[in-house]
């Protein structure tokens, strides 16, 4: 497989397929392939590694409502600076060398992904103003691809963390107006972000519950499914709705959580049972 890729690259380089100004099939093939197998892949893997490290090092306080999302505090953010700068540098090089933005349409499929990674790197560095600019660009510039809604989700996340409540609400409303256009793979996150907005503004716990339950319907990965489920159990428990709280605590026990989450789910389940009558 790797030999085929190398042979293909050598062939198209030999044919002089380096222009980013001419929309030809061979130019698109060259820049799609080289952007994917050069900086973008390395940047994506580095981002995955650092986010996983952040999750592994995170310690939840089960005496409090768990946060829906795990973000770095100031000290953790600073520890990520060097790696996030590498992500930004690699993705910026991909964009500079391989972008084919012709007639208001990007012809290279990894360019929007590179912008998105730059936005995430800025988010984790807590450079919220720069992150907002990047995610807004992804959402507005790539109107013909579904990944624009990934940019929208992270744009709203950024507004929430930056306490730009009016802007967060504006783009939540915008996302809601386009809800039927959002691909299912991004609907789970959109609903979870909506729930996060309600909870961080202390606005409406029942609506947050509704959004998190919707998020679960569209969420496949175990990490987020477990987290949404535990927060739902806590929210129902807080509302003294013990039957659904116990149902979600029991669900957690079937989802292969880590020892700490399992232990606290059992304790909370017993407490909910005791007061449920």
Set out the residue ranges of the language-model regions.
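N-terminal secretory signal peptides that target proteins for export/translocation
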Residues: 1-2
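Acidic, polar-rich low-complexity tracts and alpha-helical solenoid repeat scaffolds
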Residues: 18-277
């Amino acid at each position: 497989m790797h030999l085929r890729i190398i042979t293909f690259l050598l062939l198209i380089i030999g044919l002089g397929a380096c222009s980013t100004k001419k929309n030809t099939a061979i130019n698109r093939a060259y820049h799609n392939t080289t952007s994917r197998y050069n900086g973008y892949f390395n940047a994506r893997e580095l981002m995955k590694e650092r986010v996983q490290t952040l999750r592994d090092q995170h310690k939840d306080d089960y005496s409090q409502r768990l946060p829906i999302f795990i973000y770095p505090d100031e000290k953790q953010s600073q520890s990520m600076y060097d790696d996030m700068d590498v992500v930004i540098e690699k993705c910026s090089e991909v964009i500079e060398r391989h972008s084919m933005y012709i007639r208001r349409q990007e012809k290279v499929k990894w360019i929007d992904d590179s912008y998105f990674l730059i936005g995430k790197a800025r988010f984790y560095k807590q450079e919220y103003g720069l992150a907002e600019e990047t995610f807004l660009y992804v959402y507005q510039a790539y109107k013909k691809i579904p990944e624009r809604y990934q940019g929208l989700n992270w744009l709203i996340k950024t507004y929430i963390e930056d306490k730009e409540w009016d802007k967060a609400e504006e783009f939540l409303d915008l996302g809601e107006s386009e809800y039927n256009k959002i691909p299912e793979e991004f609907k789970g996150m959109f609903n979870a972000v909506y729930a996060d907005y309600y909870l961080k503004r202390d606005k409406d716990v029942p609506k947050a519950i509704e959004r998190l339950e919707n998020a679960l319907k569209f969420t496949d990965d175990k990490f987020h499914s477990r987290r949404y489920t535990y927060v739902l159990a806590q929210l129902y428990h807080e509302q003294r709705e013990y039957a659904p709280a116990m149902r979600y605590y029991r669900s957690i026990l079937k989802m292969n959580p880590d020892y700490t989450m399992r232990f606290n789910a059992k304790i909370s389940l017993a407490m909910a049972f005791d007061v449920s009558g």
